[in-house]
Amino acid sequence: MATSLTWHDVLAQEKQQSYFINTLEFVGKERSAGKTIYPPQKDVFNAFRFTELHQVKVVILGQDPYHGPNQAHGLSFSVRPGVPAPPSLGNIYKELASDIPGFEIPRHGFLQSWAEQGVLLLNTVLTVEAGQAHSHANLGWETFTDRVIAALNEQREGLVFLLWGSHAQKKGNIIDPQRHHVLKSPHPSPLSAHRGFLGCKHFSQANQLLEQQGLSAIDWTPRLPEEA
């Protein structure tokens, strides 16, 4: 396992590609034109800032960022402190409460403590226009995040990928199941959670898979910075 590579090494090449330059240019122009784009510019690449390539243990794929005020901050499913947990995250907490002994549902939806333990919270599209779900789909972000997943697949071994819903599962087709652990279920959204997300036990399974490799388990209780 080559642990010396960083996200900077892996992604520097992508940043030279025309598709990536065009994507950032489009988003920059939208912001300049006065449109509200989430997350704020400084937070777009937070998934990579909080979880370095060699630290990744678990990958949770989301779709695109939350498009309501003060929600998105660059980590899939997570919202800023002080913002109520959206419905999908509420179902994630519900599953954790039934899966992990002693888990108590927190009053916040800030998942940065997961990221700091090696859970890469990656959306497949990294920006969105306020109030317009999927408005930045097919701009080029999907190509970028495909390259990210390919880098994880090739540079690391024994990662646990949690793929919830058909979008994430299709995205995960490039993952080699001989090198990594791939757990699949329906999406935690209220539309589909009852079809098999609730009861999937992915969080305890992920910890078992990590411990079998001699790695520390994830503390799935999300902690605000002052609780750390």
Swiss-Prot record:
Asked if Hydrolase is a keyword of the record, the answer is yes
Q: Where in the cell is it found?
A: Cytoplasm
Q: Which residues form the active site?
A: D64 (proton acceptor)
Chief place of localization: cytoplasm
Q: Residues of the signal sequence?
A: none
Which CDD domains does the UniProt record give? UDG-F1-like
Q: Which SUPFAM superfamilies match?
A: Uracil-DNA glycosylase-like (SSF52141)
Q: What keywords were assigned to this record?
A: Cytoplasm, DNA damage, DNA repair, Hydrolase
**EC class name:** hydrolase
Its EC number is: 3.2.2.27
- Tell me yes or no: is Cytoplasm among this UniProt entry's keywords: yes
The reaction(s) this protein catalyses: Hydrolyzes single-stranded DNA or mismatched double-stranded DNA and polynucleotides, releasing free uracil
Its GO CC terms are: cytoplasm
Report the GO molecular function annotations.
Answer: uracil DNA N-glycosylase activity
The record's annotation in InterPro entries points to:
UDG_fam1 (IPR002043), Ura-DNA_Glyclase_AS (IPR018085), Uracil-DNA_glycosylase-like (IPR005122), Uracil-DNA_glycosylase-like_sf (IPR036895)
One GO biological-process annotation of the entry reads:
base-excision repair, AP site formation via deaminated base removal
Q: Which HAMAP family match?
A: UDG
Q: What does this protein do?
A: Excises uracil residues from the DNA which can arise as a result of misincorporation of dUMP residues by DNA polymerase or due to deamination of cytosine.
Q: Which family does it belong to?
A: Belongs to the uracil-DNA glycosylase (UDG) superfamily. UNG family.
Instruction: Tell me what this protein is called.
Output: Uracil-DNA glycosylase
Organism encoding this protein? Pectobacterium atrosepticum (strain SCRI 1043 / ATCC BAA-672) (Erwinia carotovora subsp. atroseptica)
Lineage runs:
Bacteria, Pseudomonadati, Pseudomonadota, Gammaproteobacteria, Enterobacterales
